[in-house]
Amino acid sequence: MLIAALALASALVVALGWQLYQARENQRWLSQRATQPYIGMYVPRIAMTSLDGASRRLGEPAADYQVLYFFTTGCPHCRASAPLVKAIAGQLDAASGGRAEMLGIALDPPAAADAYAREHGFAFPVIASQDRRSAMLFRARNVPLLLVIGRDGRVRYARVGAINTKEGVNGVLTAVRRKEASPAGPTTKES
């Protein structure tokens, strides 16, 4: 009888431990889903003005794809990513067959964003926006953030963190080569 009671108590402890583990995993997944960009996520369409004075629509590609690069001028990871971001911009037309546009979104004042874009030789339009609410709609809590948006307004590729490897470049270029959108699923690649 005592052995049966101990076995039952042990089984109960294991079952409760497993339920606690699953609850924590679900909470982590929900928290990440609510705060990080993910493949298949719909993004809003927001009108903004780039530093060159042109009207731009984030989340609404003029072509088949829109590559959005969120950064801040004081971020060391953004500075480290700048050379490969510039390389991505240079290879985008060839990889997408001219069906992709790239926009930089600096979460800084216009003067700082313009100086940063010139310093790093960004040949793509840059938008200066200090509106954190707009950035949060794209889940740009952490920078650098690189998103590839399809014509349907869904994220096809998301990368949070430094873009400092060829894999980061290839991920973006592969996303703009694909014909079909990826299904919704959890994932951001962090480095």
Task: List where the protein language model places each region.
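Thiol/disulfide oxidoreductase modules built on the thioredoxin-like
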Residues: R118-F122, Q130-R177
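N-terminal targeting signals for export/organelle localization
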Residues: M1-V43, S191
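Short active-site neighborhood of thiol/selenol oxidoreductases, capturing the structured segment around
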Residues: R56-R79, V85
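Short acidic-hydrophobic, aromatic-tinged amphipathic segments that line or gate anion-handling sites
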Residues: M48-T49, P125-S129
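Hydrophobic beta-strand anchors of alpha/beta hydrolase catalytic cores
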Residues: V67-L68, M102, L146
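Short, small/polar residue-rich loop motifs at catalytic or cofactor-binding pockets
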Residues: Y42, D64, R141-V143
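Structural microenvironment flanking redox-active thiols in thiol-disulfide oxidoreductases
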Residues: R79-H120, R133-M136
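Compositionally biased, proline/threonine/alanine/serine-rich low-complexity intrinsically disordered stretches
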Residues: R178-S191
